[in-house]
């Protein structure tokens, strides 16, 4: 698994939680799993998380070079998962092993929300170009909408694996007095 962040990265979010759950499932089925991610201050260069070998090397702009070098020194892998989040690892260009692209969302207009011009325009352009370059690489996503956007960009093979939901119901919901008016806030990213 090539992902810019791993579960212990201070900037890790939902994508890393979902990825960890999928990879944990592979380990439980007897597979050997390695997760290559960016290094971060205070992060060990290597550790095991839930049976997954996590390697951290390189930074925001150099991790893909470190991954490429590290991969070239390894025996072949059965599968390399190139996780996209804005910018992929371009593994099909340097990895002779079978590659799958894993994507949670096509960023598209999200570039505008996080980056000023011209970075937003460059990001959108790069993403469209990248998806065309990856058109023959099998993609894996969970969302119908992402599948539709990938299809519009010319991606030929898309496997949709819905997100699993692990919930534990409250055994008891304590009574509590609520003041009127009731207000609710939801925060997400």
Model-inferred region functions:
Residues 118-140, 148:
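Membrane-proximal helix-turn-helix segments that form the acceptor-binding/catalytic region
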Residues 56, 70-89, 100:
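Short N-terminal targeting/anchoring amphipathic segment
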Residues 151-156, 164-181:
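Acidic anion/phosphate-binding donor-loop and adjacent secondary structure
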Residues 79-81, 94-112, 119-120, 140:
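Active-site proximal beta-strand in glycosyltransferases
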Residues 145, 161-164:
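Carbohydrate-associated surface elements
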Residues 4-18:
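A short, glycine/small-residue-rich beta-strand->loop->alpha-helix junction that serves as a flexible
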Residues 140, 176-189:
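Conserved donor-binding/catalytic core segment of Leloir-type glycosyltransferases
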Residues 5-9, 25-61:
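N-terminal strand-loop element at the rim of the active site
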